Regions:
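Short, composition-biased local secondary-structure segments
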Residues: 1, 61-63, 69
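Intrinsically disordered, low-complexity regulatory regions enriched in serine/threonine/proline
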Residues: 9, 69-113
Length: 113
């Protein structure tokens, strides 16, 4: 069973899908690292992806059983809570769209309490 993750400030929980396939990761934009893990970075932007203030970073280990997911600043160094600022509502909407797409591709699933 894969671990459960919560994005900083969100109340939803996610885990890896039991039907996760390697080709689905590659199709979704995950990049294989030198160590064999799979990284995914997506800028969360309103106008231009080149000046996005935040980005979604995900990592899945090479055994496809451990997930990390975090929203960071543009440099990728600081965790950011996009849910407590009302001006970032479009960013939250974009995040929801990305997570829904990853669920439809059977990469992640929402965990029900």
């Amino acid at each position: 069973m894969a671990n459960t993750v919560i994005i900083n400030g969100d109340n939803r929980k996610f885990t890896l899908s039991p039907e996760l396939k390697l080709y689905a990761l590659i199709d979704a934009g995950f990049v294989k690292t030198v160590k064999g893990n799979f990284n995914y970075e997506h800028p969360l932007y309103n106008d231009s992806p080149y000046n996005a203030p935040t980005k979604l970073k995900m990592t899945i280990n090479k055994d496809l059983n451990h997930l990390t997911m975090v929203i960071t600043d543009r440099n990728g160094l600081q965790k950011v809570n996009i849910f407590k600022n009302k001006q970032l509502a479009p960013t939250v909407e974009l995040l929801n769209y990305i997570l829904k797409d990853l669920e439809e591709r059977n990469i992640i699933v929402a965990v029900k309490d």
